[in-house]
Amino acid sequence: KHNMNTEKLVLSLKETYNDVDIIKVNNFDISTINNYQKVGLASGIYWGKFSKNIEDLLNKILDSDIKNLFFIYTSGVGKVRYEKKLIKKLEEKNKICLGIFSCKGFDNYGPFKLIGGINKGKPNEKDTQNLIIFFKNIY
């Protein structure tokens, strides 16, 4: 079971920006994509990349008319090299990356399971506040 780190962050946005649509990837209908001027994708990082569902949706969005995207992710190890690949992917499709927000999240996968996990209590209130500031700048 995932630790829901990223979901906790995203749901905190809804408290401040109640007009924002937050849709779980499995419930998103790609045919509605053009109803939006900007789209954000949020995921935990699993072995160095977004979840497969988010990757699949991103590839569909890259083939749509949507130009403006932003990303939110949590990771046990913090910032990942994945961002460079992600930005390159967007640039190749003439998309604009409005920003990428990341913070550490509780991680008890792989070797971290042996020590009871790392980053207990993350994301925390400070991370939530930083996300709201990030979002305000792109909203």
Task: Identify the role of each PLM range.
Residues 5-23, 35-139:
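FMN-binding flavodoxin-like domain, especially the glycine-rich phosphate-binding loop
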Residues 25-29:
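Conserved SAM/SAH-binding loop
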Residues 31-33:
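Short conserved loop adjoining the S-adenosyl-L-methionine
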